[in-house]
Amino acid sequence: MNKIRKGDEVVVLAGKDRGRRGVVLSRVDDERLLVEGVNRVKKHVRPNPLKGEVGGIVEKEMPLHISNVALFNPAAQKGDRVGIRVLEDGRKVRFFKSNGELVDA
């Protein structure tokens, strides 16, 4: 079970966008994820007439390592560590380690 998933709101812990919040758009692989509005770079794109692409400078999000983000805890209003707990009915749920609240209600 992944501790951070697509659609979660996260806080950036390290790097040029430290402290910014964003929503996880996708997981690139097991260790990296795309966060909306965070780690934006300008990419120079060459025109390709065969595909109908015009050239120019495109601004896009680049992946962040999962260790550089923390799940946003709305009760504490900050990034928080996440644990996994097994309930009585056998379901695995995520919870915030600071206050024990369930992430997946």
Curated annotation (Swiss-Prot):
Q: In the record, what terms sit under GO molecular function?
A: rRNA binding; structural constituent of ribosome
Output the CDD domains linked to this UniProt entry.
Answer: KOW_RPL26 (cd06089)
A UniProt-annotated Pfam family: ribosomal_L24
UniProt keyword annotations, A-Z: Ribonucleoprotein, Ribosomal protein, RNA-binding, rRNA-binding
Q: Which InterPro entries match?
A: KOW (IPR005824), Rib_uL2_dom2 (IPR014722), Ribosomal_uL24 (IPR003256), Ribosomal_uL24_CS (IPR005825), Ribosomal_uL24_KOW (IPR041988), Translation_prot_SH3-like_sf (IPR008991)
> Does the UniProt entry include the keyword tRNA-binding?
no
Q: SUPFAM superfamilies of this UniProt entry?
A: Translation proteins SH3-like domain (SSF50104)
Could you name the domain of life of the organism this protein comes from? Bacteria
Gene Ontology biological process terms in this record: translation
Q: Does the keyword rRNA-binding apply?
A: yes
One Gene Ontology cellular component term attached to this UniProt record is: ribonucleoprotein complex
State the Gene3D superfamilies in the record.
2.30.30.30
* Subunit structure and binding partners: Part of the 50S ribosomal subunit.
Family statement drawn from the similarity comment of this UniProt entry: Belongs to the universal ribosomal protein uL24 family.
* Protein function: One of two assembly initiator proteins, it binds directly to the 5'-end of the 23S rRNA, where it nucleates assembly of the 50S subunit.
Record's HAMAP family?
Ribosomal_uL24_B
The molecule here is called Large ribosomal subunit protein uL24
